[in-house]
Amino acid sequence: MKILLLGGNGQVGRELRRSLVPLGDVVVATRDGVEADVAANFDEPAALAAMVRDVGADVVVNAAAYTAVDKAESDADAAFRTNAEAVAAIAAACTDTGALLVHYSTD
């Protein structure tokens, strides 16, 4: 099974990296591409959806989020793009490819 993990360098993502390895081939995507197999551009939802389609995973696990709460108030557009528009694009790409989507969030 091929698993695409978005947000693999975050608090939840790092734990998921360890937990998902026994389940299949894990492809890690991060915003900056550091310690990742692919870069995930959350500022461009269409590009993000294309990346999801290109990877062709059976399961997409989204642990990525805009988590800078104070900054989100002053940069609401970026927070909305990452936490809403990007997630919608990921969901649409999963629908197109038949991939199962698992979305994680913390508060």
List where the protein language model places each region.
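NAD(P)-cofactor binding segment of oxidoreductase domains
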Residues: 60, 74-102
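NAD(P)H-binding glycine-rich loop region in Rossmannoid oxidoreductase-like domains
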Residues: 42-82
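SDR active-site strand-loop-helix element
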Residues: 6, 29, 62-64, 101-106
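Conserved glycine-rich Rossmann-like NAD(P)H-binding loop of the short-chain dehydrogenase/reductase
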Residues: 11, 25-33
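Structural signature of beta-strand start/N-cap positions in the alpha/beta core
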Residues: 2, 25, 56-58, 100
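Rossmann-fold cofactor-recognition segment
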Residues: 30-46
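N-terminal Rossmann NAD(P)H-binding glycine-rich loop of SDR-like oxidoreductase domains
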Residues: 1-23
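A generic structural signal for well-ordered alpha-helical segments
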Residues: 20-21, 52, 94
